[in-house]
């Protein structure tokens, strides 16, 4: 009787929930929600789990920021769009919001306040100023005043973030070069800007080469920059302490010692740009290394996040914070026995370990922080865990999580004084008599900033990746299931976008659109999907020649009108389920034979890597050749890696695994990587095809495990760009199988939500996944 009653209540609630969704005209996929309810929401979660923190397995609405059911997206997008969209089979609720457009240039306008900062010994850079010559001259005046001969500026921040915030975009303020990668060497002569080859065309377009010398960093000349600096004549060189990594610093230091073996390097930290106590006497036998607490280049105003952190629920990541901390403790107990202090400085590691997410970055749900672990060898436990962050951004449930896991909270700015005044004095002196066992004071990331690194004696610092890098690189089954769900949602958004493009192409209205309006459109379609947070990076929307710029970003200056030409879309989203990244190259006209040939050669490499079988001990760099071989055979190549790791609602580019021509390491089951070969013809067009895939175990023999990949991305390739004469029957078979999987996955969801998609989208999905005929010969 009781069971029957409970069953009745459950069915009633489900029907009621469905009616609420329909009557409320929500943009969620109702049927998908029902079909995936158990898998997406309860996989790996039990009320009787051994989690120390029950709030981590609670429903979404326990988070103060109310991240469930795409409310976050609507909070952003409902105020960001400033042009009208035509009605194209949108749901009624979407139609009501058709005046909404997402503005990618300032996604956090509603959650940021502006703070004015000032400093006497700095260049005051107004965000709207556009005079690099004047700014460069002002910087040189400050350098001359303080007897600084060489000043190094690096596009980075305190945490080695790939995509940095406005407060750290100092190179663009001096040079007008806006790429994510760059190292600027300022001297009394012509400054030198080094950029990664990915940004070569962008730098050539943006940089005034009458003012600056442009140098390109490639795979075969990565250390050239250190030779360049070593060749300069100087007595004093200065670095931004918070934006310079120890890896760069130590490589340069070594290069200078080799170039000038008779010179002595004198290092000094300069606090608050107070140069009064610096020895300014020119001594030809001394090289002064100044580590600046504050940069010589100051951004006068920049956005500051005031939005609170939230708990990333265990139903999405499969493990409590306490479980992850215990796993880290095991590493210190059994694997890392020569150090008792561990400082995490990489923000995705901290967010992953604590199951927290935030809003300090535009495209990654991270927050400024450090996390210090102090291990007691006698107790075999952590004596202290100290979390440095913006305390006012911690809501009650997050504070509760931290308290349960015995995490002490301190303000973000206290990290340097705490290490200097509390941690360092408490470290016992080590007996280094045993050459086989070197005891270190602290373990730091190789990319830790100089302000932290210089607090310690370098010989007592263990520079190595933390165990968390490997922990988060290997996803658990719950994470893989959620990543699949994120990519299904992503595939539906791409389907709507490319269907919209095709409808507009037929009426030629598409050719009144621009790269930027198409970027806004695809970002908008993603925003309608359940549990979407924001884009995972700045969407690359590139038409014609702009598609040849690998990391192209359309601006008001470069924004091109859409032409009947090749169009490359590289985009992704952050969902509570996971992070996505996908690239599709299409053509809005009739492709040439050359365009078809190159697209097909790129696709052949992509397909080979997609289903390759390899032994578990294989270095991932060996897989890179597989994606390039067809291009190599035609004397072609691409100047970027083939695959990068991807986080789960973390960074879209994640460490711990990669596929590239150099470096690499063996891959493990459940690692998630991209597969993205390409080819780029300057001033003509570019092609890139990118899927997300995860490592699967294919076979285990007596001696070896054999691995392969399975797809996460759920969107078909462009059949219009195929040169069928270059494809084998096996490749065509694989294409058909993949497209059938996409159809079988997305079509039921499209049919179940006619208000959101409609018959036209359904027909379009069937059309683009139609099987390709197998060759007769």
UniProtKB/Swiss-Prot annotation:
What is the protein's major site of localization?
other
Binding of substrate: at which residues?
Answer: 551, 640, 653
Signal peptide residues are 1-17
Q: What class of enzyme is it?
A: hydrolase
Q: Where does Mn(2+) 1 bind?
A: 581, 644, 676, 690
Indicate whether Hydrolase appears among the record's keywords. yes
User: Posttranslational modification, per the record?
Assistant: The N-terminus may be proteolytically cleaved to generate a 73-kDa mature form.
Give this protein's Gene Ontology molecular function annotations: manganese ion binding; metalloaminopeptidase activity
Tell me if Glycoprotein is a UniProt keyword of this record: no
Q: Which domain of life is it from?
A: Eukaryota
Q: Which residues bind Mn(2+) 2?
A: 570, 581, 690
- Full protein name: Aminopeptidase P
Biological classification of the source = Eukaryota, Sar, Alveolata, Apicomplexa, Aconoidasida
């Amino acid at each position: 009787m009781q069971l029957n009653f409970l069953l009745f209540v459950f069915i009633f609630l489900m029907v009621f929930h469905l009616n609420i969704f329909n009557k409320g005209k929500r943009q969620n996929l109702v049927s998908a929600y029902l079909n995936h309810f158990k898998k997406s929401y309860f996989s790996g979660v039990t009320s009787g789990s051994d989690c120390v923190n029950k709030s981590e397995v609670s429903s979404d609405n326990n988070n103060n920021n109310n991240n469930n059911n795409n409310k976050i997206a609507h909070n952003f997008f409902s105020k960001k769009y400033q042009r009208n969209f035509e009605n194209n089979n949108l749901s009624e609720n979407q139609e009501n919001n058709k005046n909404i457009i997402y503005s990618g240039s300032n996604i956090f306008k509603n959650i940021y306040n502006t703070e004015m900062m000032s400093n006497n010994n700095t260049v005051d850079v107004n965000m709207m100023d556009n005079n690099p010559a004047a700014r460069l001259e002002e910087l040189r005046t400050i350098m001359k005043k303080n007897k600084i001969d060489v000043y190094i500026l690096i596009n980075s921040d305190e945490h080695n973030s790939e995509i940095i915030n406005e407060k750290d975009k100092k190179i663009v303020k001096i040079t007008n070069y806006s790429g994510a990668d760059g190292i600027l060497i300022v001297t009394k002569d012509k400054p030198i800007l080094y950029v990664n080859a990915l940004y070569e065309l962008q730098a050539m377009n943006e940089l005034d080469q009458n003012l600056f010398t442009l140098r390109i960093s490639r795979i075969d000349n990565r250390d050239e920059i250190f030779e360049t600096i070593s060749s300069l004549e100087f007595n004093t060189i200065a670095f931004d302490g918070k934006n310079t990594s120890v890896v760069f610093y130590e490589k340069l230091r070594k290069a200078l010692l080799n170039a000038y073996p008779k010179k002595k390097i004198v290092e000094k930290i300069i606090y608050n740009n107070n140069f009064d106590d610096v020895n300014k006497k020119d001594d030809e036998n001394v090289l002064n290394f100044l580590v600046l607490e504050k940069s010589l280049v100051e951004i006068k105003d920049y956005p500051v996040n005031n939005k609170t952190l939230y708990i990333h629920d265990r139903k999405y990541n499969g493990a409590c914070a306490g479980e992850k901390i215990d796993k880290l403790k095991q590493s210190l107990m059994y694997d890392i026995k020569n150090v008792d202090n561990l400082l995490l400085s990489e923000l995705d590691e901290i967010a992953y370990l604590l199951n927290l997410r935030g809003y300090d970055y535009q495209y990654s749900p991270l927050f400024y922080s450090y996390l210090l672990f102090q291990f007691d060898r006698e107790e075999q436990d952590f004596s202290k865990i100290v979390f440095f962050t913006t305390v006012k951004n911690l809501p009650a449930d997050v504070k509760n999580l931290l308290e349960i896991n015995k995490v002490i909270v301190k303000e973000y700015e206290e990290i340097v004084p705490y290490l200097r005044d509390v941690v360092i004095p408490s470290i016992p002196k080590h007996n280094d008599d045993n050459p086989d066992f070197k005891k270190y004071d602290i373990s730091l990331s190789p990319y830790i900033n100089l302000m932290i690194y210089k607090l310690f004696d370098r010989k007592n610092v263990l520079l190595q990746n933390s165990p968390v890098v490997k922990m988060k690189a290997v996803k658990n089954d719950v994470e893989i299931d959620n990543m699949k769900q994120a990519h299904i949602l992503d595939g539906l958004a791409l389907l709507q976008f490319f269907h919209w493009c095709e409808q507009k192409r037929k009426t030629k209205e598409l050719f009144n659109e621009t790269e930027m309006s198409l970027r806004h459109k695809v970002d908008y379609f993603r925003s309608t999907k359940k549990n979407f947070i924001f884009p995972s990076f700045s969407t690359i929307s590139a038409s014609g020649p702009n598609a040849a710029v690998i990391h192209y970003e359309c601006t008001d200056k470069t924004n091109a009108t859409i032409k009947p030409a090749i169009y490359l879309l590289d985009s992704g989203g952050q969902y509570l389920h996971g992070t996505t990244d996908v690239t599709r190259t299409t053509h809005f006209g009739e492709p040439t034979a050359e365009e078809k040939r190159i697209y097909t050669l790129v696709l052949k490499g992509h397909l080979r890597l997609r289903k390759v079988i390899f032994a578990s001990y294989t270095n991932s760099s060996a897989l890179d050749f597989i994606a390039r071989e067809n291009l190599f055979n035609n004397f072609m190549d691409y100047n970027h890696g083939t695959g990068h790791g991807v986080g789960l609602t973390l960074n879209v580019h994640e460490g711990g695994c990669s596929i590239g021509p150099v470096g690499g390491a063996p891959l493990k089951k459940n690692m998630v990587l991209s597969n993205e070969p390409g080819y780029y013809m300057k001033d003509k067009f570019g092609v890139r095809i990118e899927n997300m895939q995860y490592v699967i175990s294919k076979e285990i023999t007596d001696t070896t495990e054999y691995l392969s990949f399975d797809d996460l991305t759920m969107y078909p390739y462009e059949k219009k760009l195929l040169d069928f004469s270059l494809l084998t029957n096996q490749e065509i078979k694989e294409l058909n199988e993949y497209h059938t999987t996409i159809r079988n996955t997305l079509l039921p969801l499209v049919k179940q939500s006619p208000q959101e998609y409609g018959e036209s989208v359904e027909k379009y999905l069937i059309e683009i996944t139609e099987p390709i005929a197998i060759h007769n010969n």
